[in-house]
Every structure is written in structure tokens, then in C-alpha cells.
């Protein structure tokens, strides 16, 4: 018994794990205090806990058994740096980086293995198009390469979805050109062939390059790429804005751009062309010279003719017209909408409607212009993408799904405030500047609102836009457009010789007398009459406006009344005779619903001017913004060439003043710094006279619309030698681009 007792005492585990009957056998009376079934359940439960802990935490046999409360606590821990909670919280970025590294490492290995397994694949990539193209169908440009013993490639200056543009030197013509290299793919080739056809058609009707369209010199196929050779141009208008730190250019310079663009759109609207550009934006309007205001429109890759519309998704979003957004039929008016957006952006420095998508774009348009008319939305296939129709038949703008973007109520973001009409311009930056009065801004706002008419049928047309008072100059205004006399494709001057008392009119196939040149690009031309008076423009004076029914060309080309003869001298030894219509009363304008009465005569002889060889005092009040690509004036000390004033007692006409007083040749021979636009020192963009006897000098000049003549509307304004000198000083200070420096960066012409 003693031995058994020792054995029992030495094995506490047997006592702990023994069932109740073993305690009875040992003489211990513990089982009587609890029921037999309860004891069995308790022992079974304890055994399960022990088994679970033993399997979860393997203990060393030599380790002492923990207390019951300690059995639930882990004895070993994972490295905190590898804990999932830490990886997905504090080290989340590191985790993602590691995932990316592993993913791309595997991808790179698979790519290398694939190339190793199929050596022909790598060889095929190398010799695509006999090694001349990359895998994106673009020609591999090599600087210094010579093409066809004619073109020496200088550098790549542009790239786009169409292909690439390179700067090259033409050794035959001895000039720099821009070559647009189309991708070696059928779809791009087909579209480029349309562009070539349209460019050739436009150049055919603009042989003197007067209408601000880029000149396509020639085209050819080279190594399976269609190549278009263009004249070399300078910066685009977006580059110009960027170099003003997006503060915008002056209203004077904006006016110059506006008139040239309207002239170009008038040219595109001629019946023989009827071309829609479809992608007007600052990037597609290029300066001809970094120190001049002359511009040209480029990139007709998306263009089409009126009867051959191909695409529905056209125009860059910021400049997309309502009819394109709404899916209704479009015509040439979409380019006028784009122009309105561009002009505001050029002056404010910021896009007028900068939508992130089409819904946002329409919402931003509605903020400024209000809800489109119901008759437009009722016919629009995509109206319900942007608007919802109320039970009473009106339309409201749809609320955004996320509700994050908040828009101002329709029509409450006024253009009046955007332009800063009464606050000194955008941001008050133009306060006190000459040419930025409230009256100037009211004219600008009015013409922009006419360009941004929702209804394409009543949206102002180029012909009428050119006659808006924004382009006119009054007796007290010296900063409006300059003395360009240039012709529109629809209304040309015919040649004539003799004195100012002789007038000849060319009907171009139609009979009758000429009454007006109102389709010409300078509708600001003021005319002398016997009393020495000239017409003055009031703030909202717009003699002809958008008609209710859209017309390609102005109504009434001929009238029975005899024209008034006016002489305007454009050179000390020359003068030009124009046909001026009799005075007419201004027709009051009701926006989008005006009625207009005008008489015009269509001249078909392009590029011909009526010149006579007599010296006369020159007329001062004739503003026009046309800037020739070849003819500009410097500000100097001598009075000669185009700015000279000849004193003549035989004429009582007032004189048209240029802002510089040295001839065009002097400007051409003057070295031009490549990185500056200081017009106060090197010339001015304010005024350019562009009627010459030498047809060669007319290259790059716009057309010249004449204004209606109205007697006794203002005092005569005569310019003396002293006044001209003072005028030159004013122009030096008010030069539209004085102080604007643009870093040299050649821009492709298309």
C-alpha cells in the first residue's frame, strides 16, 4: 500500500485526468459531491481545450505547463513589419509599389522570353516599312536627312494623331518649309487626301494669299507617306497666350485677330468653297511672323464642304458649338461659334467654356447664355443628354448624378462681368489703357454675343460681323483697326485709271452700277464728302446684322442709285478710287431677329485695285486690322513712303494715317530678334495700309469692305505733319503687344 501511495503521489497527471471511478478505487470520496454525468461532461470539455491548445501552440516537453488563463495567450508573435494590418495601413504605398515591381518584372521576363522564342517577331518590328517607320506608322525622322535631293530635314517640330511635322530647307526654292508627314496607314491617307483637295481648292481661289489660309506649296509621296509642303509659319495663338502668363492680349490686338478671322470665314463661305473648318481653336491659328499680327488658319484635316459632312463628333470641346453638342445638322456657323469663344479667350487669357466633358461643357455654356430655345431642343436628338423637359413644355438643365459640381443658375454668369466691361477689363488689368474704354468693351461684348447665338440661323455671319461697330473707328478713337483695304472673294474692286473724277465699275458678268463693297474685310472704312465730314460709329452701331433667314451672301448686290466716288490715297504717288453707296439709315437691330436692307454689287475680278497716279492728302479715319505678311511699317524719324503726308491744296480730303513712318522695305530689311515682340521698338501692329499699285506687294493682304457713307455725321478730321508726329508717339505707347516676349519656338503650319 505504501508503494502504491508513492506511485499515486508521483503521478499528479493521473490524478488530474483520472475518471471518477478511479478516485473511488483510491479511497478518495470526491465523486459523491457531484453527479456522475456532470463530471463526465466537465472532463470531456477540459480534454478538448487541452487538445486545441496543444495543436495551436506546440510546447516543448521541457516547458512547464502554463496556468489555465495563460493557455489562451500566444507565446510567439510574427514580425510586425510583415503583419497584414501594417502592410494595409501604414505601409500601404510600399505594398502597392512592391506589387507593381513584381508584376512588371514578370511581364518583362515574359516579353523577353517571347522575343527569344520568336526571333522573327523582333526582326519584323525593326524593318517595318523597310525600316523607315516605327510601330505607330510614323516615319522615323532623322535630322540632316535629304529627301529627293531637294529637302534637307532640320528637325521635328510637331506631332499629332495625323502624323508628324518637320522643319526642312527647300534647296530648289531656297526657303524654309514645314512638311506634314502623314502616317503610313490607309485611314490617315484618305483623310489627308481630302485635306489636300480642300487646300488646293482654297489656294486656287486665293492666288494672292489674301485671306489668311495657310498656303499648300505642293505634296508628294515619299516612302509610302503622303507629305504636304507648307509655308513656314510662327507661333500659334495658344503659344502667345502662354507667354502672357494667360493674362490675355490687348483688345486692340484681339480686334486685329478678329477681323482677319472673319475675313477668312467670309472667304470659306464663298459658294465655290463652302468649307467648314470644323476645328478652329487657338492652336490652329498661327502668326505669320513673331513680330507681326498677321495670322493664318491651319489644319484642315477635319474640314469638309457643306454638302459633304462626314463626321458628327467634331470640333475641340472648348470650342464646340451647341448644334454639334445637341446632334442637330450643322453648317458653316459652327466656325463662327468657335471664333466667338476664341476671341474671348484671347483677351481674358482663359477659355470661356472649359468643360471637362460634353455635359460639363453644355452646363458651362448655359451658365453664361441661359437655356437654349425650346424650338432648338425639341428638334435635338441629344437634348435629353443635357436637359429634361418639364410637363409644361419648358426645358431645364439636368442635375449631375454625383451632385458634386455646382453650376450657377442659367444665364447668371454674365459675359459683361467676364469681360470686365465696367471694371477695366478682365480682372481690372486694362484699367486706364487706351482703347479699353467702356464703349470699346460694349462693342466687343455685342459682337461676341452675336457670334454665340444658340440658333445657327440667326448667328451673325462673317459678312455682317465685319461691318459691326467693333471694327469701326470714330473721331475720338485712335486704337481701332488700321487702314487695310482688302477685298473679299465675293466683292472685288475692278481696275481703273485716271483722276479722282473718273470711276469705272466692273460687273463681273452682271450689269448695273456698283453700290458698295460691304463684303470686304474692313467694314470700318470712313469716307470723305464735300464738307470734310465722315461717319462716326456709336457703341452699338451695327449697320447690317445677321438675317433671320441664313444666307450665304449678302442680299441685293446691285441697286439703281449711282455710287458716290471717294478717293483714298495709299501711297504718296498713288490714290485709290472706291465706290461708296449713298447714305442709308441704320436699321435697328433686334438680336437674332433683325431685318436688314442693303445694296451691294458683286465684283468678280479678284485682286484688282482701282489706282490713279495723283498725289493727294491722305485720309486718316479708316481703320482696319488687316496685317499683311509682307507689308508693315517701322516707327522712325523720317516722313516718307506709306506714312508721308503730301500737302495739297487741290484736295480737302482727310488723311488715313499709318502708325509708322518708314516704308515696308525698311521693315523687311531690319533685323528681327527671334525672342521678342516689342512693338514699341520694332514697329507696331496697330495700323497697316495694304493697297498698292504693285500686285506682288499685295501678298497676304485682306479684302477691303467699304462702309456706307453718311453725310454731316461728324466734323472733318485733318492731319498735319505735326499731328502725324504726335500720332506716331501715341502708337509707340499703345502698341497692342508691347512688352510681350515670346520665346522662339517654330510652329508647324499645319
Swiss-Prot record:
ATP binds at residues 157-165, 180, 230-233. The keyword Amino-acid biosynthesis does not apply. InterPro entries: Kinase-like_dom_sf, PKc_DYR1A/1B, Prot_kinase_dom, Protein_kinase_ATP_BS, Ser/Thr_kinase_AS, Ser_Thr_dual-spec_kinase. Residues 151-471 form the Protein kinase domain. It is found in: Nucleus; Nucleus speckle. Residues 584-612 are annotated as: Histidine-rich domain (HRD). Gene3D superfamilies: Phosphorylase Kinase, domain 1, Transferase(Phosphotransferase) domain 1. Autophosphorylated on tyrosine residues. The gene is dyrk1a. Keywords: ATP-binding, Kinase, Nucleotide-binding, Nucleus, Phosphoprotein, Serine/threonine-protein kinase, Transcription, Transcription regulation, Transferase, Tyrosine-protein kinase. This is Dual specificity tyrosine-phosphorylation-regulated kinase 1A. SUPFAM superfamilies: Protein kinase-like (PK-like) (SSF56112).
